[in-house]
Curated annotation (Swiss-Prot):
Molecular function, one GO term: DNA binding
GO cellular component: chromatin; nucleus
Location(s) in or outside the cell: Nucleus
Assigned protein family: Belongs to the HMGB family.
This protein's name: HMG1/2-like protein
Length: 149
């Protein structure tokens, strides 16, 4: 057999293909969803911005006024980062204070959100238990009906 492959060669080729397929899926960004991970709640309050992000919001507005033709997000981010690094601690202080205030507000809203969740969980848990009890009663009645036949 001039052009044919031996059994050993074909098995090697198959295992190489299998390895490549596994590797290709991982490299193409085909992430598997995490098992047991709950989906994010859209009603949950967002985390507060850090001092840098508070600064960046102000800087972005000023940068757009000074450079109206610049549409590059990367350029704005780079300029902002360089400006932030050049600031002294005294110059950063107002942004740190604003970030702390936002963090305190976040903690208050998060506590309120968690209280709402606890209330919903208690109500849902009692509803579920009632329905489960009702389902069990119905099942027992069905079994009794079958015994009568």
């Amino acid at each position: 057999m001039k052009g044919g492959k031996s059994k050993g060669e074909s098995k090697k080729a198959e295992t190489k293909l299998a390895v490549n397929k596994k590797g290709a899926a991982a490299t193409k960004g085909g992430k598997k969803p995490a098992k047991g991970k709950e989906p994010k709640d859209p009603n949950k309050p967002k985390r507060p911005p850090s001092a840098f992000f508070v600064f960046m919001a102000d800087f972005r507005e000023q940068y757009k006024k000074d450079h109206p033709n610049n549409k590059s997000v990367a350029a704005v981010g780079k300029a902002c980062g360089e400006e932030w690094k050049s600031l002294s601690e005294e110059e950063k202080a107002p942004y740190v204070d604003r970030a702390l205030k936002k963090k305190e507000e976040y903690e208050i809203t998060l506590q309120a959100y968690n209280k709402k969740l606890e209330g919903k969980d208690d109500e849902e848990g009692s509803d579920k238990s009632k329905s489960e009890v009702n389902d069990e009663d119905e099942d027992e009645e069905d079994e009794e009906d079958e015994d009568d036949d």
